[in-house]
Amino acid sequence: MTGESLDGSLHALTIELDALRRENANLKQQLKEKDGACGELPMSLEEFQRYGRQMIVGETGGLSGQVKLRSARVLIVGAGGLGCPALQYLAGAGIGHLGIVDNDVVEESNLHRQPLHDTSKVGLLKCDSAKEALSRLNPYCSIKTYPVRLSYANAFEIFPSWDLILDCTDSPMSRYLISDVAVNLGKTVVSGSGLGTEGQLSIYNFENKGPCYRCFYPIPPRPGSVVSCQSGGVLGPCIGVLGIMMAVEALKILFGIYTLENFKPFLMQYSGFPYQTLRMFKMRNRKQGCLCCGDNPTITKSTIESGHIKYEAFCGAINYDVLSKDERLSASEFEANYWSQKERGFVCLDVRPRLHYEISHLPGTYNMTVKELDEMEGSIEELQKHIPVITPDLDIVVLCRYGNDSRLATRILKDKFKLRNVRDVKGGYFAYIDEINPSLPKY
């Protein structure tokens, strides 16, 4: 190619570049005119329309308040009964960035109280199901998922990039961990819990000034005293109310309604039955001697990450590993060696709560709870008042819902009542349904 042809090509490219620049400038001007005469807008016109009826509520702070939400980063730990409604309303309100920590999968038994999920999502990770639903609800919301179980080993990797934490978990162990990590990172926590038809919520470590969860509860609950949703049940709308109230508290924090000058620690208690009631209790400020947020804390980032803080042991987790392999039966072994036999020279004791037992049970079984067994003196005569046919040498098979309480009951029967031939069914009543008789109802 000659110098003359190169000059010609360069000239042509220069002309084309100038044309593209003019086109770009025209497009920018058209966009400005479309957005209005007020110049650069902090949101798209679609977002103005979407959040308009929220922005005109005085408490939200108008446009400036909405811009705060748009840039906010909120992490929700747990996409269950509390997390689902909280996520829905926070995404709907226009939170710009949401994080979801949950390693559970959607089960059919979740759907009555976790409205982000639906039947088609059964078997999917909850965080993925929630992300899909929230993205349909609000495409302007960026969502990051963490399909992991929160632990001391990963909490300090997950929490730092988020402005606000919502604790929507269902165990004291998780609540202590979340609070401890939040204190060490200077994060505020909105914490809720619910069971049956009631629940409560609080705000911990507001603006890193306390109080924290340990200030409220320096002593953990007694082992076995904490009832889960699986065993105690939950009414969907009641837990939903609490999740929505958590979203309200989160928005108040992000709007700047609460300040260091006006914030007072509180505990809010909700009850759905027999009449709906909501009570607010004033709580004390940060305890100077608190092990985490006090003047001389011993619960630090290093002690947490090292595993030195034994959350499970501190919260009195029940040790179910109390039987040898020989003291346990599979559902198939129970069916073949006991239940299917015409001559039943054994007793089957179902230790689920009475309400569970009445929903569904195997015919001919007896029903007593672990608590009832534990509270007895330990004489065979006392036990015979409830199970007349029982003798010290009779074969006894113990059944519960999942195969946990039955282990404890088996140990009690052998150690306290000195019964020789007692075994439990691994996986409990539900394992029997899955493996032997799927026509029985699960609940």
Curated annotation (Swiss-Prot):
InterPro entries recorded: MOCS3/Uba4, Rhodanese-like_dom, Rhodanese-like_dom_sf, ThiF/MoeB/HesA, ThiF_NAD_FAD-bd, Ubiquitin-activating_enz
Task: List residues binding ATP.
Answer: 81, 102, 109-113, 126, 170-171
What is this enzyme's EC? 2.7.7.-, 2.8.1.-
- Record note on cofactor: Binds 1 zinc ion per subunit.
Task: Spell out the catalytic residues.
Answer: 229, 400
Give me the residues that bind Zn(2+), please: 212, 215, 290, 293
What does the record give as cofactor?
Answer: Zn(2+)
Q: Which Gene3D superfamilies match?
A: NAD(P)-binding Rossmann-like Domain (3.40.50.720), Rhodanese-like domain (3.40.250.10)
Any single GO CC term annotated in Swiss-Prot or TrEMBL for this entry: cytosol
Where's it found, cell-wise?
Cytoplasm, Cytosol
What does this chain do? Plays a central role in 2-thiolation of mcm(5)S(2)U at tRNA wobble positions of cytosolic tRNA(Lys), tRNA(Glu) and tRNA(Gln). Acts by mediating the C-terminal thiocarboxylation of sulfur carrier URM1. Its N-terminus first activates URM1 as acyl-adenylate (-COAMP), then the persulfide sulfur on the catalytic cysteine is transferred to URM1 to form thiocarboxylation (-COSH) of its C-terminus. The reaction probably involves hydrogen sulfide that is generated from the persulfide intermediate and that acts as a nucleophile towards URM1. Subsequently, a transient disulfide bond is formed.
Species of the source: Eremothecium gossypii (strain ATCC 10895 / CBS 109.51 / FGSC 9923 / NRRL Y-1056)
UniProt cross-references to Pfam families, sorted A to Z: Rhodanese, ThiF
Q: Name one GO biological process term.
A: invasive growth in response to glucose limitation
Q: Does the keyword Nucleotide-binding apply?
A: yes
Q: Part of which pathway?
A: tRNA modification; 5-methoxycarbonylmethyl-2-thiouridine-tRNA biosynthesis
Please classify the protein's predominant subcellular localization into one broad category: cytoplasm
> What name does the UniProt record give this protein?
Adenylyltransferase and sulfurtransferase UBA4
This protein's encoding gene:
UBA4
Q: Which PROSITE patterns match?
A: RHODANESE_3
One GO MF term on file is: thiosulfate-cyanide sulfurtransferase activity
Listed SUPFAM superfamilies: Activating enzymes of the ubiquitin-like proteins (SSF69572)
